[in-house]
């Protein structure tokens, strides 16, 4: 399996998963969870992925990779997810996928971690449940979740966009559930020992 790396000394790759398919078209699902070990807040400007072969030659590049959150606090986690399709005829030669992170000099929004979130896998879906534990209607809540094997390989990931939820309100003590259909490559590797983890944030713009 191809390895996922990050040359940025501020971030450490903790878990990752690469699901490659070449039955109908050359495509890959790439997931990673990185830890901010810099001791500083990191406002994310953009994330790129570079696919390399065993000798380090670039086979393909994705310039705008999905991620969550938009600002990573010290010791916080950064979720990264990308679907690459028709990206190379050399899919069998892929040895590594390198993540490059560009940051801003200052943050223009704050991503506050929320309690009351959990994730689970049931059948063909990854579910995320968020309960508003505050006394006010909660707007701008964004969730992310991973489905992993017992040894930490990420099989699938759900990432929400703040644009999708900024005007959605969750009443106090109320619960909302989202779901994502698992990719085919993930369902083939499902076992009784899979583990789900969830994150939730409230986005506030300065």
Predicted regions mapped to residue ranges:
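Low-complexity, acidic Ser/Thr/Pro/Gly-rich terminal tails and inter-domain linkers that flank the onset
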Residues: 1-27, 31, 97-125
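Asparagine-centered strand-capping/turn motif at beta-strand->loop junctions
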Residues: 22, 34-39, 53, 130-134
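Hydrophobic core residues within well-ordered beta-strands of beta-rich domains
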Residues: 28-30, 45, 78, 124-126, ...
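Short, structured motif recognition centered on aromatic/hydrophobic residues
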Residues: 32, 42, 47-51, 138, ...
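Short acidic/proline- and small/hydrophobic-mixed sequence motifs that coincide with surface turns
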Residues: 39-44, 58-60, 137-140, 154-156
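Short aromatic-acidic-glycine turn motif
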Residues: 50-62, 147-159
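Intrinsically disordered, low-complexity Pro/Gly/Ser/Thr-rich segments with frequent PxxP/GP/PP motifs
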Residues: 59-89, 157-186
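Terminal connector regions
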Residues: 83-125, 181-206
